[in-house]
């Protein structure tokens, strides 16, 4: 059952805590948009065990959409801001 089917989650995430949290929300049916830097989440490059992709990355990011942006670019920041404003849930685990 997809309890969170109509919920939009936007997550600017890396490492473990936020990706694990948002993957659980995706498992429950939420639409999760993972915002990534241009070079991609560093976890993408840990290994190439799952059809050339990192097992860790695939496990923590299953069921998510990915939006690649440069947060230093004004236009990209505007896009992210608009998406966050339409989200039901916003997750981030960046340095304060």
Question: For each of these PLM feature ranges, what is it?
Answer:
Residues 1-96:
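N-terminal helix-loop segment corresponding to the beta1-alpha1 unit
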